[in-house]
């Protein structure tokens, strides 16, 4: 029996979320609520694709369509959402034999490609898989250009004391000094999102991207997921907020999502302390992994993130053009991606 595709509807959201929960690669970004928030804030149309064999689900594939001028661009995830990855999920992937994994994924991707061509009539598509979804061959075999990317994940299953011992010695010294100088870390509220949104916008400007106000987007994520799956940590020094981060919590992993803006303070390291306090919180809350989200495409970020002694975790970006004409416009697409985020 071949795989068929179905566009999920609002009444399918609990069924959809169950499939995300049942996939070893499912992330909070794949959940129905998060997808709808992203659709709202990115000027995109969501296509939540269900893959079925008969009535049995085999996977999901969230896609976002954006129309720009005369082009139809498909993303998973879309620009301007500050999501590193999304892409397909296969149900019970870790429980399948390798031959079964391959046959399902290959057919699922072929069906998806047919849908992109016949129904969406795409000109460009970019898919970014979630961490540890390591089989990129079905993309390669169907004409995609594939690029490896990397995020950072710390094993915190043995507790905060072991995590602390594994840190770079200099980081431990900097954290202790920052505490002695009087920087305090606390859990933040929705009011702290204004500081974080402004800091993130400034950082994008510094990196050559167009400024964007993420306040309403972050507010919606906060209202949908706080406190169970969304936390804020902020650092204060001499009565002022000097740093902060947002933490997404799903399954066994807590992930540093947005935050840790560059600070001009000399001799103290509030971002290091905030990361450490959020790691301790994650340990105490029963999480087994702490992710410092990264794409691995900006070497400037390596120095900050690697000093916490994380492990590299592989994921992929796969992209494809509908024809050589649009392939020839690659520089235009690259410029569009840069200015849109």
Spans of model-derived segments:
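Short catalytic-loop micro-motif centered on adjacent basic/acidic residues
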Residues: 125-126, 186, 288-293
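Conserved acyl-donor/pantetheine-binding loop and adjacent beta-alpha core of acyl/acetyltransferases
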Residues: 65-87
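Aromatic (often tryptophan-rich) hydrophobic motifs at membrane interfaces
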Residues: 50-57, 94, 219-328
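A short, internal acetyl-CoA/4′-phosphopantetheine-binding micro-motif in the GNAT/acyltransferase core
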Residues: 85-100, 157-158, 259-268
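A conserved beta-strand-loop-helix scaffold within acyl/acetyltransferase catalytic domains
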Residues: 3-71, 130-267
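Active-site/acyl-donor-binding loops of N-acyltransferases
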Residues: 65, 131-132, 140-162, 287-341
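Acyl/amide activation-and-transfer machinery of modular secondary-metabolite enzymes
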Residues: 79-90, 146-153
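Non-catalytic accessory segments adjacent to catalytic cores
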Residues: 103-148
């Amino acid at each position: 029996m071949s795989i068929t595709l179905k566009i999920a509807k609002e009444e399918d959201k609990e069924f959809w979320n169950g499939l995300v929960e049942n996939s070893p690669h499912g992330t909070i970004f794949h959940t129905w609520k998060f997808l709808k928030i992203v659709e709202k804030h990115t000027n995109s149309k969501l296509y939540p694709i269900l893959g079925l064999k008969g009535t049995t689900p085999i996977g999901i594939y969230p896609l976002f369509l954006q129309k720009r001028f005369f082009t139809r661009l498909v993303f998973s995830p879309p620009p301007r959402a500050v999501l590193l990855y999304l892409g397909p999920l296969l149900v019970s992937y870790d429980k399948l034999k390798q031959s079964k994994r391959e046959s399902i994924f290959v057919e699922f991707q072929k069906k998806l490609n047919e849908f992109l061509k016949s129904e969406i009539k795409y000109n460009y598509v970019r898919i970014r898989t979630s961490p540890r979804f390591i089989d990129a061959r079905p993309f390669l075999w169907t004409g995609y250009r594939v690029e490896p990317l990397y995020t950072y994940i710390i094993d915190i299953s043995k507790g905060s004391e072991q995590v602390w011992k594994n840190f770079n010695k200099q980081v431990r010294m900097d954290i202790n000094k920052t505490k002695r100088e009087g920087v305090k870390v606390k859990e933040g509220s929705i009011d702290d999102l204004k500081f974080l949104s402004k800091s993130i916008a400034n950082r994008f400007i510094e990196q050559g991207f167009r400024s964007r106000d993420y306040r309403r987007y972050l507010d919606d994520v906060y209202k949908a997921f706080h406190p169970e799956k969304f936390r804020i940590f902020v650092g204060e020094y001499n009565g002022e907020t000097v740093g902060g981060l947002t933490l997404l919590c799903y399954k066994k992993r807590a992930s540093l999502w947005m935050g840790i803006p560059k600070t001009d303070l000399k001799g103290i390291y509030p971002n290091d302390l905030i990361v450490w306090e959020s790691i301790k919180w994650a340990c105490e809350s029963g999480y087994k992994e702490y992710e410092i989200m990264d794409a691995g495409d900006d070497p400037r970020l390596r120095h900050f993130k690697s000093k916490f002694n994380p492990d590299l975790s592989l994921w992929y970006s796969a992209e494809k053009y509908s024809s050589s004409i649009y392939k020839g416009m690659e520089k235009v697409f690259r410029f569009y991606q840069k200015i849109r985020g």
